[in-house]
Amino acid sequence: MILRSLECRFLTIALCDAAEPWQLGSQDAATPMMQGIIDLHHDIFFFLILILVFVSRMLVRALWHFNEQTNPIPQRIVHGTTIEIIRTIFPSVIPLFIAIPSFALLYSMDGVLVDPAITIKAIGHQWYRSYEYSDYNSSDEQSLTFDSYTIPEDDPELGQSRLLEVDNRVVVPAKTHLRMIVTPADVLHSWAVPSSGVKCDAVPGRSNLTSISVQREGVYYGQCSEICGTNHAFTPIVVEAVTLKDYADWVSNQLILQTN
């Protein structure tokens, strides 16, 4: 019982960076972009609660006071200047309060870094992904590239998430501005990591750009968010954020393996 209690308490404070069964809320924010999305959701939800309370009160009050038992002869009110002004202005002001922070967040998300520290190209295939780190070239002037396949359902290791783990993760340094270039090799794909607040579609014939800056170390899981064929559900995305030193060591090892 004590171990079970400690386990539940640990799960309560542990960060959520992958989808969970019956999950209703968002995953924990790993980037300023995702934190902005969560904050905007909370702000809009506040206005929704106000509208719900106001409309419910008006509805209950109308049903309570204006019925056949309490008021057999209905009142005939055909005009009310004050209430008409209020019910016209009030619904117009609420969307304004919602639109201003929404557009501010939208334009900040749409902005692409002019001079990012690292550029990573994600190429969608049926049904795996290829990644290119064009900032690091090996001796034969080829970019650091590798393929990322999902680990089969019957071959996971202890601690790996079922149908969410891959053989080669996307390793990035934490607290570093990154630029993602997303494009497909065949059909429509998408590169989406909920904890990062990123969903960038891979449209045939186009290269879409998005920016990302992971603020804490960890492993973040995502999946393809556009129907891309039979194995659409089996193309996960795994991003591992590490320290800058560990990232440099990983790049060095990958370049050595690629040249051999």
UniProtKB/Swiss-Prot annotation:
Mitochondrial matrix compartment ranges equal: 57-88
Q: Which GO terms describe its biological process?
A: ATP synthesis coupled electron transport
Swiss-Prot/TrEMBL keywords: Copper, Electron transport, Magnesium, Membrane, Metal-binding, Mitochondrion, Mitochondrion inner membrane, Respiratory chain, Translocase, Transmembrane, Transmembrane helix, Transport
Q: Where are the transmembrane segments?
A: 36-56, 89-109
Q: Which GO terms describe its cellular component?
A: mitochondrial inner membrane; mitochondrion
Supply the Pfam families for this chain. Answer: COX2, COX2_TM
Q: Which cofactor does it need?
A: Cu cation
- The name of this protein is Cytochrome c oxidase subunit 2
Give the source species. Answer: Oryza sativa subsp. japonica (Rice)
